[in-house]
Amino acid sequence: MNKEFDTLQMQAIEAHDGKYLVLAPPGCGKTEILAERIARALDRGVKPEEMLCLTFTNRASRGMLNRVCERLEAKRNELDIFIGNLHRYCSIYLINNEVIPENAYILDDDDQTEIISDLNSTLVHYRTGNINRNAINYISGLATYIDQRRMGHPESVLPSGPGVLDTKSGDFLTRDFSYFYDIAGRYNFDPQLIPSQHQALTCALQYSAYKKSHTALDFADLLVLAYDHMVTHTDHIRYSWIQIDEVQDLNRLQLAIADELTAPGATAMYLGDEQQAIFSFMGAKLSNLDILRKRCHGHVLTLSSNYRAPSYLLDVCNTYAEQVLGVSPEILPRAVRDEPHRPLDLILTESDDPEKEAMRIEGMVDYYLKLDTAGKERMAILVSCNAQADTISEALTAAGKSNFKISGTDMFRSKAYKTLTALYSVIVNDFDMGAWTRLLYGLGCLRTQIATRDKVHAMRSLMLTPSDLLRHKPYIRQVYELYTGGEAVVFDTETTGLNVLEDDIVQIAAFKIRNGKKVAGSDFNIILHTDRELPEMLGDLPNPLIAEYASRPHMDRAEGLRLFLDYTGSLPLIGHNITYDYLMLRNNCARELQEDVTFTTFDTLSLAKLVAPELKKYTLASLVDTFGLQGENAHLADADIEATLSLLDHCMAQAAGVLRAQEQFIANRSTQLIAARLGKIAPLRSNITSYLHLPVSVTGRTIADDLAFTCRTLTEQGLIDEIGPKFDIFLRYVQSEWVQRDSPGTLFDQVSAHIRDLTVSINEGDLVNSDELITDRLFIMTVHKAKGLQFDNVVVLGVNDGTYPYFTADNVLRSPYSTTEMKQRARAQIKEDARKLYVAISRAGKRLCLSYTRVRQYGYLAGMSPFLHSVSHLFHTGRRS
């Protein structure tokens, strides 16, 4: 064991055979506990495929995954355990269970905002261009609610909203989602028939219709569809060992999904901290902890030792937790580090107004950085909103103080970054229409994403991808002309495994086709000798190659490969998922014959995706079944090529009807302009493709190296803007987190393994946790983005009455017109604001400064937050200004 654990930590680590709730305040070693539990479960014989580890954030999942790999001394891509957030899990689940197409367009927040604001232009201010985010969220929530009601989901997992935007007054009306569902039901959900005064409802229905027509899903859809499939398919996968982190941040639907994934009698551990429940605006339900307390009765543990904060800082957190949050002193953590402190380690300072407070920030920064003589301490300035973070960062940068800001303007959401990563997405998957949309839009092929998405959708309906604009002829036309007037070899291989760099080909089967017909007497079928062990199972099925190998004579490997090359000559090769077989062939020939062989290849997998892009699965067996074709996918090469030819015949029959329309579409002037713009990246794309499947050990080019090169090339060509200095930090992150922690493989392997990280899940907060990556010692961010992070010195700005708690909640409580429901929500918001401030003060590891102003923005009276009354005596009081 690499670390000693205290008694309560050991109880949490060794807990099994039951359901457990572990309440873990900040600094109690939660991540180490989670990692150790996984290691010990594996030691006890729990199978990796029976284990599931869910986290709330991608940052948390990466931290846990890294700890587990360090503990097990394993590479990340060797660990067959899902460790990640629920959205990611549901995405994989939906594809594996054929609920959504594998190339479904997953809309991010920016996509969602653009689509909804395009459907309802009143959501964009006509002068400033500012978008009403609250209305966007309401409309998307309403669309989700309607979908769930139509699916018959129970009330307990439905979203709820405060009201709908009144487009005349700009205010929200207190109408429940169910009110609008009832209206929609009267008109059979047709948005064109909804009365004009219900614009939000119309927009929600139009948004749902848009997603359906474009095979698109948003993040909420991933959860809703996964839950619906689970409750209607009781034989779905369940796990006998499951642990879920940050349960206080889950909404009811997410908790219900986790419950569906938990097998009867499973070992289940839930970890959370109600003092850090600050995500109700995302649907999180603090009451989940009450549900879990009852579920885990008798198995509730509260970790009581804080290993991170010195005693004087923990005294502040504990006093606040007891007096403001109402936490029993019996369960508050004790400090392991009983260190003396100087008076200025805890500062409470007052300024006249926000402008004066901002003027003092530079002095605060100088003070804390001068205390750090070793130059290793990190400082955070925490604020309540993104706009304030932007303003402070700009001012400090202008003053020559380098800082790392995390706000709403995340580098990973920039147009330049999305364009860069979209290029890699389409290189590894030509049928990712979402990535093509981002790439074409980012390159300036069309003016808006809406127009770009529609153009890509039109191409999809014509059996085209934008790659066809870079070819001399569209892919499907090339195959059609070869099929109807040429000669080719249909072939397949069976192998000892899936590693194209190392595994052996064992069987090669082929025949020739000419003018769309199989050439009589052209059958080719050999077994090659191998010293490698054949896998006993192919998924859930016994491997038929074992019996075939045992019953037939074996050829010398070099002799057999030479025989096939002589048989093929220079003819093109056709196969299903031919990239795999072709790479196997090339690498086997390189090993056995010391020859670099190349062929023109065509893939029936690609043809099927062009012909039927809406399908959920594209294995040879499923396509034979879906299209009612002859042949079977027997996992023996000689049988599989017969099925492949049957699939080829079907695809060519379908293609014949669109070739003329393809010609007309490509000849259109607007398409030609897109092709010309897209052509600017053709040499770069071709270059990357040339070494995509070569071992990184040969090319010396990792994913980090390639991202740097491609970004530089696109920038120099003026195709994307400068991404900025944070991109260099990201490249160091990629090298340390992905390249060094994974087995090397090829560039294709690295990109494929991390394409979701590249394009969806990463954010600037993921870069903060390593001193090795970021040389900046000063960080600026909102409290929400600071959750889960730790800094030596923390300054919390604007700790005012009116911010903590937010003034609107007080206004609701004072108003004689507020309903009981409105007052309940206001009280809940005040409690959450109190927890938000707790999260802020608990980020500090050495020193803490809380700053407030006597008046807030626009001259409203403020003063110190009432939440601080119970702890103000613990602080040194700073001067006024």
Q: Where in the sequence are the language-model features?
A:
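Conserved P-loop NTPase-based nucleic-acid remodeling module centered on helicase motor cores
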Residues: E50-Q148, L158-P159, D290, T600, ...
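P-loop NTPase Walker
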Residues: M1-E102, R238, D315-N318, Y838, ...
